[in-house]
Design a protein with these regions (language model features):
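Nucleotide-activated donor-binding/catalytic signature segment of Leloir-type glycosyltransferases, i.e.
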Residues: 240-256
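Active-site proximal beta-strand in glycosyltransferases
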Residues: 93-95, 104-124, 150
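Aromatic "clamp/platform" in nucleotide-sugar-dependent glycosyltransferases that forms part
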Residues: 276
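Membrane-proximal helix-turn-helix segments that form the acceptor-binding/catalytic region
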Residues: 128-150
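A charged, aromatic-enriched C-terminal amphipathic alpha-helix characteristic of glycosyltransferases
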Residues: 314-318, 325-352
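Carbohydrate-associated surface elements
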Residues: 155, 179
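Conserved donor-binding/catalytic core segment of Leloir-type glycosyltransferases
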Residues: 150, 187-206, 212-216
Length: 352
């Protein structure tokens, strides 16, 4: 792809709401700019004040009546607003950070399927028919996209096609694995033995209370164990109560700048990730880059080299045994697969 490109990245969230999609959008923008192209990131923050909260308001109203299809409506109204206010005929390339906000255009485009809502409802009690209705709408959404659709790992693609959507997807889905700036991980620091760390949202999908129950067993076995939790979310109050109840040596750092996250990772020894669902996991990637030994559920749809020790279930004793019993060094992995440059090049190439 020759010449200087004008690229617009559309992200259907707010800049201040951190997470994997937000990180990806910003990494893409900086990576594209570093290659000499022009890149603009459009978020809900860029909409007129009276409209920027409309997608989330519509989502809540529709979900109150017809849960969980409100997520589809949120994507639809976001797409309409972005198209009205930010569609540019002089752009060379459009990147949509979600299938729900993607529209067909004569401009070269790609839609990124980080995950689908029907696979991200762990915090809710969803009836089978409700889930089926949402899946059907998502399948129709994907089939209506005329430009390439990519997802973030081979494992997640296999899960979506053969399991989640039960081979009902007719569209070809490509894979572009995510990448991050690895510069700050090159610094080596002395790791504190028995120091465990977790980074991510404190929400149902991340299974944070299970992590605390596992840590309680570890601490009762060896009082040298320490746990640092980086992140925030709706499960924080429950986590604080559990920590106080059992007087555990757990540090809750909340949301902190990314540079500080990296510094924390570099000084810990073990990364324990008790999430029940992932399609890639920046957190596991960063833990590997920082040289930590990683423990995670074997059923996650992440690159296999992200997990050093896999646990096949969510039995507390099995996690305890795995962490106590596995004293091997972290496994080596090819970090060159997960650079921003490679991610940008693959993304632009897929869109033609």
């Amino acid at each position: 792809m020759n010449g200087r490109l004008k690229v617009i990245i559309f992200y259907g969230g707010f800049k201040f709401v951190l997470g994997g999609v937000n990180s990806h959008a910003n990494a893409l923008k900086l990576g594209i700019q570093s290659m000499g192209h022009e890149a603009t990131l459009v978020t809900l923050d860029d909409l007129p004040f009276l409209l920027k909260y409309l997608p989330h308001l519509l989502e809540k109203i529709v979900n109150f009546i017809f849960f969980p299809v409100g997520y589809i409506y949120k994507g639809t109204i976001t797409k309409m607003l972005f198209k009205i206010f930010f569609a540019r005929t002089d752009a060379d390339y459009l990147i949509f950070e979600d299938i729900y906000i993607s529209w067909n255009s004569t401009i070269r485009s790609v839609a990124i399927m980080h995950a689908v809502w029907s696979d991200n409802l762990q915090a809710f009690n969803v009836a089978p028919q409700q889930l089926r209705n949402l899946k059907e709408k998502e399948i129709n959404t994907i089939h209506q996209i005329h430009h390439p659709v990519v997802t973030v790992s081979e494992q997640y693609l296999d899960f979506l096609i053969n399991n989640h959507f039960n081979r009902e997807l007719m569209s070809a889905i490509h894979v572009v694995t995510l990448g991050i700036d690895q510069t700050d991980f090159m610094v080596k620091k002395c790791k504190v033995k028995y120091a465990i760390v977790y980074t991510g949202a404190l929400e149902a999908r991340k299974n944070i209370l299970f992590l605390l129950r596992v840590f309680k067993l570890l601490y009762e076995e060896n009082s040298l164990y320490r746990l640092t939790i980086i992140g925030d979310g709706p499960e924080r109050q429950k986590a604080e109560h559990f920590i106080d109840q059992f007087k555990l040596p757990v540090t809750l750092l909340g949301r902190i700048p990314h540079q500080q996250v990296i510094q924390e990772l570099l000084t810990h020894e073990l990364y324990v990730h008790t999430s029940i669902k992932e399609s890639f996991s920046y957190a596991l990637l960063e833990a590997k880059l920082a040289g930590l030994k990683t423990f995670a559920y074997s059923g996650l749809q992440v690159p296999i080299e992200f997990i050093d020790t896999k646990i096949d279930n969510f039995d507390i004793n099995d996690w305890f045994d795995a962490i106590i019993g596995d004293q091997s060094a972290p496994k080596q992995f090819n970090s060159n697969r997960y650079t921003v440059t490679r991610m940008v090049e693959d993304t632009l190439e897929i869109g033609g």
